Design a protein with these regions (language model features):
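Conserved short alpha-helical segments that host acidic/polar catalytic motifs at enzyme active sites
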Residues: 1-237
């Protein structure tokens, strides 16, 4: 697979929707995650990320303007032992509870499907990073309608073992802006991952469409020790 520029992918797409990037730092020492949300409606834009325990949750910036909270208020990031879960919806909890019960990432997500927001039927995208005893691997998933037909849910899981230094994968909900919004197609895109969390955070935030970007989370986990650094950027302040 040809490696693509994360910067160009984002700058060339006004509305990829929600996006997950997972990979390994260039020096090989850090497990890396990024998650961003965007919005076109006032309701979608009325959000911020806040820290909650070892993870984060979304919160209404102006509670008086909050509508339909079920699809926009959730915990995108949760940590269970050696696993860090990142998703674009409340399936974070589904994966967390499944792993807790001994299920796999893929099996945990079998109880879920795309979001019921017709006509877009927004895909549910998810990732899990496993860091243990100096080893690191990750999985990504997308659950989406069958080319806009909600009678069928198409399920794809991608597993990456013994991750290569300086590489990662990027998956997002929509191919581009549109009405209805077309679901992501193909494998997660192969991208470069830098060593520095602040450089990675700046790369993502500065490349996202200025009008549509809402919030960004990044995390670098030391593969040897499990200690991590986190950055959160919110457009609403």
């Amino acid at each position: 697979m040809k490696k693509v520029s994360l910067e160009q992918e984002l700058k060339g797409n006004a509305y990829p929707g929600r996006g997950i990037v997972i990979g390994r730092s260039k020096d090989g020492t850090k497990a890396v995650a990024g998650y961003f949300i965007m919005g076109r409606s006032q309701n979608s834009r009325n959000r911020v990320f806040v820290e909650e325990g070892e993870g984060i949750r979304t919160q209404a910036f102006d509670p008086s303007k909050l509508e339909a909270p079920s699809l926009i208020i959730y915990a995108p990031v949760r940590v269970l032992g050696n696993d860090t879960i990142v998703t674009n919806g409340d399936q974070t909890d589904t994966v967390y509870e499944g792993l807790e019960q001994g299920k796999t990432f893929e099996v945990s997500l079998r109880s879920r499907e795309f979001e019921p927001d017709a006509p877009n039927y927004t895909p549910r995208i998810s990732g899990v990073m496993h860091v243990e005893n100096g080893t690191y691997g990750y999985q990504m998933s997308i659950l989406k309608s069958n080319n806009g037909d909600p009678s069928q849910c198409n399920r794809y899981t991608f597993s990456y073992d013994n991750c290569v230094a300086g590489e990662g994968h990027f998956i997002h909900t929509y191919m581009h802006d549109g009405n209805p919004l077309p679901s992501f197609e193909g494998e997660p895109k192969l991208v470069e991952i830098p060593d520095d969390i602040d450089a990675f955070t700046e790369l993502l935030w500065s490349s996202l469409n200025e009008d549509n970007k809402v919030s960004l989370f990044t995390r670098y986990i030391d593969i040897a020790t499990g200690k991590y650094e986190t950055r959160i950027v919110n457009k609403n302040k």
